């Protein structure tokens, strides 16, 4: 799964990752090294013929849900996303890209402790995770726009930490992923198979465990000898 991530790169850096990224008129969120569920994050959507950046809340609330409860999924499985009522409509017409510099997973050690790890590109560059978004007019007095992150079975180094990982879309698949006219299940599912899995994994301090902690310290590499993994 993906239950925490970070985004500190400027939008100008993400414009090198997402083709045709439009950030004009956007009041960008400040960098966040510890984005947690229910918090706001930056996503890219296809709107008025362009790829536009917006701030949405993490935890999907479908537009048809008139009385949103506590169940606000932060992840959706790529394998079954087209079948679940919670995600089905968004899967066809409301897909997005979640701006990210890295995400965190917790690995259970032999001593019972859970050690947090940071996962990101090997060269340290930013990337985008495949997501879904929704606009719900019933969730609050002014409505609420939300998103979730799509996950897939983990591979490579990521699989040594957790059995799931976010779908990281390469540039070649992004335009079609954002295009609502691409709505056939087979077409969209095919895009999810193109995930980029070249990730670097390293341990970080348990400082990241608390969502209240939000500084660069969350993503600093911790020496393996300090994790108690051996």
What are these regions (language model features)?
Residues 1-230:
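Short linear sequence motif anchored by a di-proline
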């Amino acid at each position: 799964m993906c239950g925490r991530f970070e985004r500190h790169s400027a939008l100008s850096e993400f414009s090198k990752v997402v083709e045709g990224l439009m950030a004009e008129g956007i009041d960008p969120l400040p960098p966040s090294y510890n984005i947690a569920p229910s918090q706001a994050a930056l996503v890219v959507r296809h709107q008025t013929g362009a790829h536009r950046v917006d701030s949405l809340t993490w935890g999907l609330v479908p537009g048809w849900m008139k009385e949103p409860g506590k169940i606000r999924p932060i992840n959706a499985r790529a394998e079954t996303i087209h079948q679940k009522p919670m995600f089905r409509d968004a899967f066809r017409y409301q897909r997005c890209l979640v701006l990210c510099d890295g995400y965190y997973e917790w690995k259970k050690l032999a001593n019972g402790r859970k050690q947090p790890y940071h996962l990101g590109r090997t060269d340290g560059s930013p990337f985008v995770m495949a997501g879904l978004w929704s606009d719900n007019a019933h969730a609050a007095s002014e409505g609420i726009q939300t998103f979730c992150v799509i996950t897939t079975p983990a591979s490579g180094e990521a699989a040594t930490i957790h059995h799931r990982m976010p779908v990281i879309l390469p540039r070649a698949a992004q335009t079609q992923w954002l295009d609502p006219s691409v709505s056939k299940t087979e077409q969209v599912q095919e895009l999810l198979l193109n995930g980029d899995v070249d990730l670097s994994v390293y341990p970080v301090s348990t400082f990241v465990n608390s969502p209240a902690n939000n500084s660069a310290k969350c993503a600093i590499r911790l020496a393996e000898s300090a994790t108690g993994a051996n």
